């Protein structure tokens, strides 16, 4: 059956080309709302946003060159987690967790030192505030692991391996 041209609805170019910003992975922590925001108008990067209270202006926690992305199992996984003092996100280029505090002007810092290809791929984290560590999934070339990383930075501690 042929489709008549007059039966095809006109779609806005931005919708067809995927140029609209998209929000994903909302997280509510007390009165604070966090989300990952995909920005096609900024080279396709995904940024971490925080709104401290209803009606307050949102804050970009990963401005400029920073972008969130996980490549665990090629499909990715959870991009970020947060506590009352900081957020941890998976940085797109390195694939490793980075922490950023909520202090004005704070810059993200890696939780692991060393080349990312030796560190594995990370995702699906949470912050253990009592022990001051990030817990998450690490995929290596040989297995999947549940690991802990000190929030101050350091080497991963393997908690479980499959």
Q: What would you call each of these model-derived segments?
A:
Residues 1-22, 52-75, 100-121, 149-162:
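Multi-bladed beta-propeller domains
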Residues 10-53:
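Hydrophobic alpha-helical membrane-insertion signals
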Residues 18-32, 67-87, 116-134:
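Conserved beta-propeller blade repeats
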Residues 30, 35-41, 51-52, 81-94, ...:
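Beta-strand C-termini and the immediately following turn/loop, strongest in propeller blades
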Residues 37-47, 68-74, 89-98, 115-122, ...:
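A flexible loop/linker signature enriched in serine peptidases of the S9 family
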């Amino acid at each position: 059956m042929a489709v008549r041209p007059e039966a095809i609805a006109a779609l806005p170019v931005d919708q067809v080309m995927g140029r609209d910003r998209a929000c994903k992975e909302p997280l509510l922590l007390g009165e604070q709302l966090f989300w990952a925001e995909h920005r096609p108008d900024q080279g396709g990067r995904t940024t971490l946003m925080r709104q401290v209270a209803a009606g307050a202006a949102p804050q970009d926690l990963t401005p400029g060159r920073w972008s969130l992305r996980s490549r665990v199992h090629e499909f990715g996984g959870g991009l970020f987690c947060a506590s009352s003092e900081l957020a941890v996100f998976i940085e797109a280029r390195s694939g490793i967790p980075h922490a950023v505090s909520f202090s004005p002007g704070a810059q993200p810092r890696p939780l692991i030192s060393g080349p990312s290809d030796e560190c594995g791929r990370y995702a699906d984290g949470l912050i253990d505030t009592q022990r001051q560590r990030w817990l998450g999934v690490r995929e290596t070339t040989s297995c999947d692991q549940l690991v802990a990383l000190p929030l101050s930075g350091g080497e991963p501690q393997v908690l479980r391996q499959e």
